[in-house]
Design a protein with these regions (language model features):
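A short alpha-helical cap/connector motif
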Residues: 1-121
Length: 121
């Protein structure tokens, strides 16, 4: 029987990431902003696709890794709104979204605490 740790490694390595995702993941790691795993990202992409999501709200942008996964599963005209308290991270996410070839019209990045921002949405 396979070891549980080996199973997790296989599962995470099984999902292929685009060059843009790999670059965003590297930036996130350099910044200390822990990105979602490939397996979690693939699950987010699948959920967005199955739901036919045209609008998604994300709390905690990081460097944009989870946002890239979500946008990949969303409708081509879908918009990701993402909130992060650290405006510096939003800048990195914006650059990672652009590097992935995404139009700025597909993302809305908001700096602030989610508890302050969400009631106004």
């Amino acid at each position: 029987m396979a070891d549980k740790a080996q199973t997790w490694v296989y599962t995470e390595d099984y999902v292929a990431e685009s060059d843009a995702l790999a670059a965003a993941r590297a930036v996130a790691s350099e910044l200390g902003a822990t990105p979602v795993s490939s397996g979690t990202g693939a699950a987010l992409r699948m959920l967005a696709a199955v739901a036919g999501a045209r609008a998604v709200l994300e709390v905690g942008t990081g460097a944009g890794v989870s946002g890239l996964w979500l946008l990949d599963g969303m409708a081509r005209d879908g918009v990701l709104t993402t909130i992060d308290v650290e405006s510096e991270l939003l800048g990195y996410a914006r650059r990672n979204f652009a590097a992935a070839g995404l139009s700025s019209h597909r993302t809305r990045l908001i700096a602030g605490r989610a508890l302050d921002v969400l009631p106004r949405m």
